[in-house]
Swiss-Prot record:
This is Vitamin B12 import ATP-binding protein BtuD. One of its GO terms (molecular function) is ABC-type vitamin B12 transporter activity. One of its GO terms (cellular component) is ATP-binding cassette (ABC) transporter complex. It is found in: Cell inner membrane. The keyword Transmembrane does not apply. The gene is btuD. Its EC number is 7.6.2.8. SMART domains: AAA. Part of the ABC transporter complex BtuCDF involved in vitamin B12 import. Responsible for energy coupling to the transport system. It comes from the Bacteria. Keywords: ATP-binding, Cell inner membrane, Cell membrane, Membrane, Nucleotide-binding, Translocase, Transport. It comes from Salmonella typhimurium (strain LT2 / SGSC1412 / ATCC 700720).
Length: 249
């Protein structure tokens, strides 16, 4: 897989770094670590929303050299929290994120995949927390979806599984896998280590802004590295052919 983004000595005040790493096209990378590890700070920096020490190159060019409108065509970003805007139907909110607003079929398809087919006529400010989270996810998927956006490359998600039940998480995993197969790089923060073991290609483990380990998921999510990050003892078990992490304390 070709490198899409390169980070070198990236740092922000006392919250992050310096850290270096690469993101490749078509891979799913999970950022894991305890609260306050710097995951949200790093994602916002990778999205081009903040600045600081070090350098980030995206698509062969310095991230700060990208015009805002052009960058939005190549990468989509889901913040951890966002309140609904003024009252508008769900379908209207989603249309605002589509590069090609005539592709109503694609909007309906993504909405159906995330269980929103019967919510399109509802106002966004009348949704439950889980419904609003899925609407936000559908919006960034539509923004970057390769069927309508041939230059889409990167999807950044800050705790996308928040407020989703097990079935909704599974539906999102299927959508992300489809995007990954199409060559989109996905970087997301996660607090579910076993989900990372099942679905990520690579993982970056952070603690207090420092990168403890990075690489393939099974190389990073080891009991020794996790003990450094969380201050707990972990065991890795095999359950019906699948690895599972449990706290041993």
């Amino acid at each position: 897989m070709s490198q899409l983004m390169q980070l070198k000595d990236v740092a922000e005040s006392t919250r992050l770094g310096p850290l270096s790493g690469e993101v490749s096209a078509g891979e799913i990378l999970h950022l894991v670590g305890p609260n306050g590890a710097g995951k949200s700070t790093l994602l916002a920096r990778m999205a081009g929303l903040t600045s600081g020490e070090g350098s980030i190159r995206f698509g062969g060019a310095p991230l700060e050299a990208w015009a805002t409108a052009t960058l939005a065509q190549h990468r989509a970003y889901l913040a951890q929290q966002q309140n609904p805007p003024f009252a508008m139907p769900v379908w209207h909110y989603l249309t605002l994120h589509q590069p090609d607003k005539t592709r109503t079929g694609q909007l309906n398809e993504v909405a159906d995949m995330l269980g929103l087919g019967d919510k399109l006529g509802r106002s966004v400010n009348q949704l439950s927390g889980g419904e609003w989270q899925r609407v936000r996810l559908a919006a960034v998927v539509l923004q970057i979806h390769p069927d309508a956006n041939p230059v889409g490359q990167l999807l950044l998600l800050d705790e996308p599984m928040n407020s989703l039940d097990v079935a909704q998480q599974n539906a999102l995993d299927r959508v992300l896998h489809h995007l990954c197969q199409a060559g989109i790089a996905i970087v997301m923060s996660s607090h579910d280590l076993n989900h990372t073991l099942r679905h990520a290609h690579k993982a970056w483990l952070l603690k207090r802004g420092k990168l403890i380990a990075c690489g393939r998921r099974e190389e990073v999510l080891t009991p020794s590295y996790l003990a450094q990050a969380y201050g707990l003892r972990f065991r890795r078990l095999d359950v019906e052919g699948h690895p599972m992490l449990i706290s041993a304390t």
